[in-house]
Every structure is written in structure tokens, then in C-alpha cells.
Amino acid sequence: MGRFIFVSFGLLVVFLSLSGTEAGVCCPLGWSGYDQNCYKAFEELMNWADAEKFCTQQHKGSHLVSLHNIAEADFVVKKIVSVLKDGVIWMGLNDVWNECNWGWTDGAQLDYKAWNVESNCFIFKTAENHWSRTDCSGTHSFVCKSPA
């Protein structure tokens, strides 16, 4: 009987330690893991600069979300953004200095594009799986992304 309780307790500990993570990605409590990164949606409405600053304060290496392929975008839509009401989030892609030098706030290479041409910051319209340039002073919900 004692052995059974010990094994059951051990399995419970393993289960609880893995809950909220994907395929062994170790993320902070309340964050979801995908492909060696952690993600968390925030309902607060902020302008782009405030949202980016907020993300950098949440976890070491955290920034507004960067998307590098359709699979990652689908993960964000299905697992993360489902908690948000309007389906429009800030993302880390920007050209705040108006130099036509687009880049992700986390320093990652711009290797996947899906946008219209307009302003200097980007929102992700999750219902359409589409990016749109918009004015950086508007307010939107956002997703933070951090290395696991």
C-alpha cells in the first residue's frame, strides 16, 4: 500500500509540473509553451511602446510576440488569443524610427511576413491570421513571448 501511494504521489508531482506546458517546454506559471518559447496573452489595452515595456518586465528575455511561421501563428491563435475578446493583438514587429528597417523587438530575424502596408507598428488580426500596420499610439491587447 505504501508503495502505491508513493508512486501515485510521484505521478501527481510529474503531472502538476508539466501542466500548462507543451512537449517538455518549461514555462512560468500561467504561460504556455511551444517550440522552446513561452507565451502569455494580456487583456490590458496599451499602446505599442507600453505593451513592449510591460512584456520586458514580465520574464527575462520577454518581448511582444514574434511569429516565424504559420504553425507558430496558429498556436498563438488557438492556445493563447482565445482568452482575448477582440482578436487583435500587438506584435513585436515595428519600425518606430521610420527607417524602413523592420525588425522584431526580441532581435529575431524577420523570416515570415503577412502584412498590409500602412503605419509603423503591427497588430495581428487573429480571426484572419493576418498582420496589419497601424499607428503605434492606438491601444490593443497583446501577447508576450519569452525563451523557455
Curated annotation (Swiss-Prot):
Highest rank taxon of the organism: Eukaryota
Single GO cellular component term: extracellular region
Coiled coil stretches, renumbered: none
Keywords of the record: Disulfide bond, Hemostasis impairing toxin, Secreted, Signal, Toxin
InterPro entries: C-type_lectin-like, C-type_lectin-like/link_sf, C-type_lectin/snaclec_domain, C-type_lectin_CS, CTDL_fold
Keyword Plastid: no
GO MF annotations, alphabetized: toxin activity
Compartment(s) where it occurs, according to its Swiss-Prot or TrEMBL record: Secreted
Disulfide bond sites: C27-C38, C55-C144, C121-C136
Pfam families: Lectin_C
Function: Interferes with one step of hemostasis (modulation of platelet aggregation, or coagulation cascade, for example).
Misc remark: Shows greater sequence similarity to the beta than alpha subunits compared to other heterodimer snaclecs.
Entry similarity comment: Belongs to the snaclec family.
Subunit: Heterodimer; disulfide-linked.
Name the record gives this protein: Snaclec 8
Lineage: Eukaryota, Metazoa, Chordata, Craniata, Vertebrata
